[in-house]
């Protein structure tokens, strides 16, 4: 039997300001640290917290690499910031970081390669409680990550032997002026003016495969957010949306901070785009941006551009954490 091929997709260390930036001795090899910069934090507890986050992340990477080294696998690792090509010729992608790292890797995957997320730095509730009056000590959420350092080998073995099967999650597809954009969003997209203080002007309607259209809604607002079922627990929920079953192929949309909507328009500013529908958006600002799963992937748009948003995208195979598999809504 051919040896299976695994890609280890890593969160970089430059998201953790090292202690050396504050003038103290570095705790980690120079090769793992970003170029020195001025860290304004002086609270020793903040510095110790940042130092520990980097250490925990490094320890998790070391553990994952050690586990892979001891198995009959062909594997290689890459930092997410150094990757820009479609992922091919592998049997499994393992991300080490949090949800952001998993989302970044998903942009390079089609529906054929499964992905397993390892939360390298989970939040410690006791730490959060102890430091609540000083700073926010929450770490990585890892909502879609099935593994941590504590159970990585167990989850990996179950994935490789087929006893832990990946789930297929819906993604968002977008066409710009009829041309398919190459990125599919696993969580959500945001369409807005690039300046958050500026008004976004656009109109939208929903259209079915049979050609039936809803009424046109003209908007002045802070933008448009569209989420998948997986993304409905993130920014969409924070903005007042609702959680969708992970198996849903529908999309949820919400107009952000609408300006003086009419009474007839108000019920239409938040709703669902069904699987057999797509949303047509016409942009009326001189400039605009479409953000895919956060701020890293951005497409520019301009006045008169038409966006077609739908769930007509290849699904993503994700090894989900146990608590999501056990949800009754699934």
Which residues are covered by each model-predicted region?
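Catalytic phosphate-donor-binding core of small-molecule kinases
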Residues: 2-12, 31-40, 47-86, 123-225, ...
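Short acidic, S/G/P-rich loop/turn micro-motifs used as interaction or catalytic elements
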Residues: 14-18
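Intrinsically disordered, low-complexity regulatory regions in eukaryotic proteins
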Residues: 23-24, 136
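Structural motif
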Residues: 91-92
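Redox-cofactor binding/interface segments in oxidoreductases and associated redox assembly factors
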Residues: 95, 117, 226-227
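Short, acidic/turn-prone active-site loops that include or flank metal/cofactor-
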Residues: 99, 120-123
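Short glycine/serine/threonine-rich phosphate/pyrophosphate-binding segments
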Residues: 100-106, 232-237
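A short, gly/pro- and small-residue-rich
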Residues: 105-121
């Amino acid at each position: 039997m051919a040896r299976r091929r695994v890609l280890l997709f890593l969160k970089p260390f430059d998201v953790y300001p090292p202690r050396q930036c504050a003038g103290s001795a570095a705790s980690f090899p120079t090769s793992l640290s970003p170029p020195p910069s001025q860290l304004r934090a002086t609270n020793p507890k903040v510095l110790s917290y940042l130092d520990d986050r980097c250490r925990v992340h490094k320890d998790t990477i070391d553990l994952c690499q050690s586990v892979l080294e001891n198995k009959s696998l062909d594997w290689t690792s890459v930092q997410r910031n150094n990757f820009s090509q479609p992922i091919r010729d592998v049997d499994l992608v393992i991300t080490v970081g949090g949800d952001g790292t998993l989302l970044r890797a998903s942009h390079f995957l089609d529906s054929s390669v499964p992905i397993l997320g390892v939360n390298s730095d989970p939040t410690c509730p006791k730490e959060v409680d102890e430091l609540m009056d000083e700073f926010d000590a929450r770490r990585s959420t890892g909502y879609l990550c099935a593994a941590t350092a504590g159970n990585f080998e167990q989850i990996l073995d179950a994935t490789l032997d087929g006893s832990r099967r990946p789930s297929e999650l819906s993604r968002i597809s977008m066409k710009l002026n009829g041309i398919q954009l190459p990125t599919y969003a696993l969580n959500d997209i945001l369409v807005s003016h690039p300046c958050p203080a500026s008004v976004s002007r656009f109109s939208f309607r929903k259209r079915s495969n049979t050609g039936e259209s809803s009424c046109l809604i003209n908007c002045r607002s802070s933008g448009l957010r569209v989420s998948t079922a997986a993304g409905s627990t993130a920014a969409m929920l924070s903005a007042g949306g609702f959680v969708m079953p992970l198996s849903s192929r529908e999309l949820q949309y919400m107009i952000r901070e609408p300006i003086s909507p009419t009474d007839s328009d108000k019920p239409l500013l938040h709703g669902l785009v069904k699987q057999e529908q797509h949303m047509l958006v016409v942009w009326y600002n001189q400039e605009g941006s479409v953000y895919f799963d956060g701020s890293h992937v951005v497409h520019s748009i301009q006045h008169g551009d038409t966006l077609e948003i739908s769930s007509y995208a290849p699904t993503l195979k994700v090894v989900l954490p146990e608590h999501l598999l056990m949800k009754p809504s699934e």
